[in-house]
């Protein structure tokens, strides 16, 4: 048992070598029970010793005599021997453990010392590594710098040879050598290096010098190209003796001089100019774009000037031929011939240009030059346009260029349409000039044919009826086209367009349908001719100029034209109404219906033009000045006396012109005018139907007047309905007019019935008389039935016809 404990204790110490001594001792004496037993054993041993000493003095015989007693004491002493032995062993073990503990502490201290040494070695090693790394990086940097210095110095060293070569260049032909191209590449590399390494000493100064070398090299290229163009131009002039002789050459010979000769130098030119174009469009050269673009534009200008000097005599010669050929032709033919020639000319020039310059980067420049090339065309057409007075001709001229303005600029279709030559920009000056002339002629046309129109007394009479006899239609067709001896081409074109709409390719079996279409078109034209002449001219004008000018400009014009037409219609209507007052041969209902018919025609027609904008019109009102001078003329000194009595500031305020902002909205004005004429018509119709039947007079019989009212409605309403049908062919409008008349008469009858009922209650009328009068709801049903019968019979007649 003792060995096993020893082995376990040694094993425990070996596994926990750093446990302190105090903790080990406490562990051995941790058994409180054993400690108590040891205390008791100690007391017992002391008591036993004292008893033995007392017994020795009394006598040894007693001890010797009684072996049994001694044997018992020995046994008692041997009883604690195990514990004492154990205690001794514990003390020995404690001493041994103390030795082991001291050794362990010594080993631990040695380990701590070793760890500290290792840590110091690790720190020293890390510092060594960092220092070594820094030294290595410096060494690598210095090595790279050592290797890059010769390369960097190369960019600086090449400057002097390049400058000497450029400054001592005796001829621009040096640009044709391959070494010149290599030199340009070296300049590019040097500039790129200096831009990337701007922190180098004197980098800015060297960059400026290299930039000067680049500009100088590009200038040499430009001079070479200029000389090449001059030389080619001079060769052509020498062969033709003088520049005007090109116009007398055959077309094939002329093309050989103008184009074939230039094609021979195109490759050389393009190779050199591409060097400038490439650098002008390179992002790395943003700092030098101004100088490079200036040199490139100089190349453009020399090329264009050379071409223009050769082409101008030929162009003017051809324009003179067109002028002579189209002398008796109209403006449209002249523009068309010029347009065809210049289209071909621009196509040929574009084809030649892309052989001299890179197409993608330089396309914009040739399109700009085309405007200068076409100036002879602009000038010649401008002269012809200023002489043109016919609106139809001006519109047809604009139509020639319509295919170029179908798509919005910048759209995908637009880009596909103008991949090379932008014909929309090329012909835009012509279109603008023609449109400006067209707008001027439109304003003059409105002034002469609409505002200045003087209507006749019967302008709203029978000639405006919807139905006319076939004889009158056939006989009056030619005369109805115009109201005077001067035919109006615009109106004739407008009326003939209705006839042309029915002319379509047909088979022999469709002859009957063709006859029907012809009759319908003739009837349509005849019906149109019954309208107010300024109205027809307004519609003819708007339909002709629609989509011929800018939409905003058209809306502005359309508002003013429609406004002027409404003013002309209203003036004619007022004039006829005044002239018909008190005359039996005029019927106000016919006049109102004719006026309404024209307004409806105007309303329906302008919807097709999609007028969208309201026009704000600003002008100065000088009515105060005019009124002052008028008063001065009429009253003389009295005005001056009033002026003295009043404030001078008041007079000055009255004389200052006023700024008037007027909003022109033709659609709103037209709707307002329609409401007014419908109101006038319903009131006139109601008065004719009612007559004096709703006049209240105590001396008259109410029943007889009520019967007369019913008779008036039955007798006159069908006639009024016929009058409406003579002018209005829209059944919905006819129904609305009758409904408006019915509503107004019903309101009048309602007031009348309430009045006579009150009078009967007050005793002014006999109640039996009021009882004989139709009730309001009975009268309403009666009138509604009459209207319904008229409309039903009218629908049957329409279907039968």
UniProtKB/Swiss-Prot annotation:
Compartments where located: Golgi apparatus membrane
InterPro entries reported for this sequence: COG3_C (IPR048685), COG3_N (IPR048320), COG_su3 (IPR007265)
Biased composition (Polar residues): 471-480
Region of interest: Disordered: 470-489
Membrane topology field: Peripheral membrane protein
UniProt keyword terms in alphabetical order: Golgi apparatus, Membrane, Phosphoprotein, Protein transport, Transport
Molecular-function GO terms, alphabetical: cargo adaptor activity
GO biological process, one term: intra-Golgi vesicle-mediated transport
Pfam families (alphabetical): COG3_C (PF20671), COG3_N (PF04136)
Any one Gene Ontology cellular component term annotated for this protein: Golgi membrane
Membrane-spanning ranges: none
Chain positions found as Phosphoserine: 507, 647
Location (main, coarse): Golgi
PANTHER family reported in the protein's UniProt record: CONSERVED OLIGOMERIC GOLGI COMPLEX COMPONENT 3, CONSERVED OLIGOMERIC GOLGI COMPLEX SUBUNIT 3
Assigned protein family: Belongs to the COG3 family.
Function summary: Acts as a component of the peripheral membrane COG complex that is involved in intra-Golgi protein trafficking. COG is located at the cis- Golgi, and regulates tethering of retrograde intra-Golgi vesicles and possibly a number of other membrane trafficking events. COG3 is also involved in actin cytoskeleton organization.
Subunit: Component of the conserved oligomeric Golgi (COG or Sec34/Sec35) complex which consists of eight different proteins COG1-COG8.
Miscellaneous: Present with 4140 molecules/cell in log phase SD medium.
Name assigned to this protein: Conserved oligomeric Golgi complex subunit 3
